[in-house]
Structures are given as structure tokens and as C-alpha cells.
């Protein structure tokens, strides 16, 4: 990807939202972009697997995990599933695991931290709704751009 979030902020700041700093990059792609798809879950990644099983078509899955640091919502198996199905990236308001394996995948992954414990699988969660965390609202169909400097969203494509 050939963009810098700093340059996009300079040019389009009036129509952007910026995710608060603190999200580490765990995927093999530090820079990624795509249309947003959303999930709202809490310590249950069943819906994450469901969503990543669908064609990604270059989208970015934004998972509002409530900021939980008690288990991981994404690991190497879900990362590999995302790659197979054409997802550009995953942003998690929560934790991931299998960070070394995720780092080898051609996928963008941002999350608060790592945690070795897997989540429960009770099939609970909501999809394709606006989710807000850490200063930004993520709406299905909006655009997300992530690089080494941060994560931004826009209602319109910027590139």
C-alpha cells in the first residue's frame, strides 16, 4: 500500500476520525486499508470466525471486544482464515494471541495486547453496526487506513 496516515491527516483532517494511540501491530502487514466491517463481542470469538469465513473482498474487520484483556479474540487460525478469504486486516479492541504466527501472515492486525487464553465460543455478538471505542466510531462501509503511525477512518475513500 502506498499511503501514509500522516499525509492523509494533513490533507483530509476535516473528515477523518483517528483511533487513540496504543494499538500494536501484530500482522505481517503494518500498512493496510479497506472498507470496514464490524462486530461487537465480549470474550467470545464465535462471530469473528463466522465473519472471517465470508469473502473479505479486501475489507478490514473491526472487532469491538469491549477492551477486554482477559482472553484473545483472534489467533493464528483466524488470521489464516482471514487471508484465505481475502480480508485486508483486523483491528481488535481487545487481545490477540499467536503473535509470532500472525506476524508471518500477509495481513494487517492491530490490537491492544496479546493474551495466551482463547475466548469462549457461545455464539454471542452483533455484526454490521456502528461501534465506538478509543475516540473513533467505525461504521460498516466506511474506510479504514492503518500504518506505522496509526489508524484513521473516513466515510469516503481517500486514495
From Swiss-Prot:
Co-factor(s): a divalent metal cation
Entry keyword annotation includes Metal-binding: yes
Any one GO MF annotation of this record: metal ion binding
Pfam family, one: RraA-like
Residues at which substrate binds: 75-78, 97
Residues where a divalent metal cation binds: 98
Cofactor details (free text): Divalent metal cation.
Catalytic reaction equation(s): 4-hydroxy-4-methyl-2-oxoglutarate = 2 pyruvate; oxaloacetate + H(+) = pyruvate + CO2
EC number: 4.1.3.17, 4.1.1.112
Keyword terms of this UniProt record: Lyase, Metal-binding
Record bears the keyword Glycosyltransferase: no
Any GO BP annotation: regulation of RNA metabolic process
Coiled coil: none
Enzyme class, spelled out: lyase
SUPFAM superfamilies membership: RraA-like (SSF89562)
CDD domains for the chain: RraA_family (cd16841)
Function: Catalyzes the aldol cleavage of 4-hydroxy-4-methyl-2-oxoglutarate (HMG) into 2 molecules of pyruvate. Also contains a secondary oxaloacetate (OAA) decarboxylase activity due to the common pyruvate enolate transition state formed following C-C bond cleavage in the retro-aldol and decarboxylation reactions.
Self-association and partners: Homotrimer.
Family: Belongs to the class II aldolase/RraA-like family.
Protein name as it appears in the record: Putative 4-hydroxy-4-methyl-2-oxoglutarate aldolase
